Amino acid sequence: CGDINAPCQSDCDCCGYSVTCDCYWSKDCKCRESNFVIGMALRKAFCKNK
């Protein structure tokens, strides 16, 4: 999985329960710390391979 600022295609590509795949700033998605830690942890729980 990718660390902060790593390229990603979905939240499941990013390491850490609070790290989201952010496509907002450019067309190149990057992993970044989420402001919604609890919600992200719940979403990450559904990632199959991480």
Curated annotation (Swiss-Prot):
Q: What tissues harbor this protein?
A: Expressed by the venom gland.
Q: Keywords, A to Z?
A: Disulfide bond, Ion channel impairing toxin, Ionotropic glutamate receptor inhibitor, Knottin, Neurotoxin, Postsynaptic neurotoxin, Secreted, Toxin, Voltage-gated sodium channel impairing toxin
Q: What is the disulfide pattern of this chain?
A: C1-C15, C8-C21, C12-C47, C14-C31, C23-C29
Which Pfam family name is an example for this entry?
D_CNTX
Tell me where in or outside the cell this protein is found.
Secreted
State if Signal is listed as a keyword: no
Q: What GO cellular component is one of the record's annotations?
A: extracellular region
| Entry keyword Disulfide bond | yes
Q: Which family does it belong to?
A: Belongs to the neurotoxin 03 (Tx2) family. 05 subfamily.
The function of this protein is: Insecticidal neurotoxin that reversibly inhibits the N-methyl-D-aspartate (NMDA)-subtype of ionotropic glutamate receptor (GRIN) and inhibits inactivation of insect sodium channels (Nav). In vivo, is highly toxic to insects.
The record's comment about this protein's domains reads:
The presence of a 'disulfide through disulfide knot' structurally defines this protein as a knottin.
What protein is this chain from?
U2-ctenitoxin-Pk1a
Q: Which organism is it from?
A: Phoneutria keyserlingi
The taxonomy runs: Eukaryota, Metazoa, Ecdysozoa, Arthropoda, Chelicerata
